[in-house]
């Protein structure tokens, strides 16, 4: 193999491949980035897999001699990122035991991986793909991710993508004390989803966030995998689907539509700013904020034995039979950070029951959170 690449063109793909291969993998096989050249296509293909997530990237290159080899992915990515901009030559030595990288007077060698370790990647489905926006997908993942349980052995450790009878698609995350739901309309994707929906584990969502660009993308589905590639097919990522039975999340969100719920409307930005200041007065053991609900205001208070106390009152429109709520300050502040500006609506089932949050500017996004059962003391 003998090629010349432009460092700026390929470093992104090498970094993505390196991000897939775990640095602490038990075997060198799972740390390998594989490089296949295509002289006719004037390109190289980068391939990496951690045994679950698979990445394939195609980048331009001047190919003098075709070849195929694997090297430790993180080392190659780190080296290319550390080199100055410009052309970089790569070739195998005579015995094929090393990949030689040179740029001007700089010369480096990386040992080659055993070719027998290579496992072919699963190809992108040839038919039935769906066009979408990478930016929208990443935004949805971000809005739901924090509500997904950190448990690989539970269905609650997954993002649920479920088609609804009205043509909508739900993206839901649950963790036992919080739930997030984004609902979109995409008729093409709706038609490709199985009736029971699909589940993607949280750890693979993290891979998607690292590897997908915000431009136009194509989605592919098989019974076992979820595929994403950009429209130019330069980068492709696929992750396995989980095979759990997901709970019926609709019962939680339907409960929050009941006429018996108390309703509070408040400025999201004012509420968030007050929580940020209250957080200053929290400690590791005293980490909650007390919210008192009046007719036209919310009083937000927190304290710590060693930090003092904070009390703020902000305007609100309240129709509530619930007078007091308690939340862990940091959790509530993080929750609100996923909403845009404008008026925030809270629907409250009871003082110790669930509360739902949504804004007037985004009716298709809602989060449910459970308050703390014990009141804040010392205020």
Residue ranges and their predicted role:
Residues 1-379:
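Structural preference for solvent-exposed beta-strand-turn elements
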């Amino acid at each position: 193999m003998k090629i010349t690449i432009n460092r700026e063109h390929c470093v992104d793909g090498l970094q993505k491949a390196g991000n897939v291969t775990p640095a602490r993998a038990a075997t060198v096989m799972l740390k390998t980035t594989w490089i296949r050249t295509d002289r006719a296509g004037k390109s190289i293909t980068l391939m990496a897999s951690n045994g679950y997530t698979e990445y394939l990237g195609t980048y331009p290159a001047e190919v003098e001699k075709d070849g195929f080899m694997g090297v430790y992915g993180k080392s190659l990515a780190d080296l290319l990122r550390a080199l100055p901009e410009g052309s970089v030559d790569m070739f195998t030595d005579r015995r094929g035991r090393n990949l030689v990288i040179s740029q001007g007077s700089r010369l480096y060698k990386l040992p080659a991986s055993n070719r027998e370790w290579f496992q072919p990647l699963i190809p992108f489905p040839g038919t039935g793909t769906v066009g979408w926006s990478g930016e929208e997908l990443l935004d949805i993942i971000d809005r739901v991710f924090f509500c997904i349980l950190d448990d690989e052995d539970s269905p609650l450790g997954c993002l649920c993508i479920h088609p609804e009878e009205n043509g909508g698609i739900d993206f839901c995350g649950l963790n036992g004390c919080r739930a997030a739901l984004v609902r979109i309309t995409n008729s093409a994707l709706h038609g490709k989803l199985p009736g029971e929906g699909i589940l993607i584990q949280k750890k693979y969502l993290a891979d998607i966030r690292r590897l997908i660009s915000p431009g136009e993308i194509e989605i592919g589905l098989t019974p076992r995998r979820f595929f994403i590639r950009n429209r130019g097919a330069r980068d492709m990522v696929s992750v396995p689907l989980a095979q759990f039975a997901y709970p019926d999340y609709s019962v939680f969100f339907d409960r929050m539509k009941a006429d018996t719920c108390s309703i509070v409307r408040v400025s999201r930005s004012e509420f968030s700013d007050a929580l940020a200041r209250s957080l200053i007065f929290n400690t590791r053991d005293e980490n909650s904020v007390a919210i008192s609900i009046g007719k036209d205001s919310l009083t937000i208070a927190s304290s710590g034995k060693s930090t003092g106390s904070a009390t703020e009152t902000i305007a609100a429109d309240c129709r509530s039979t619930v007078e007091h709520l308690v939340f862990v300050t940091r959790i509530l502040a993080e929750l609100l950070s996923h909403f845009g500006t404008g008026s925030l609506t809270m629907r409250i089932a009871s003082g110790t029951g669930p509360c739902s949050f949504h804004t007037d500017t985004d009716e298709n996004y809602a989060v449910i959170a459970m308050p703390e059962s014990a009141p804040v003391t010392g205020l």
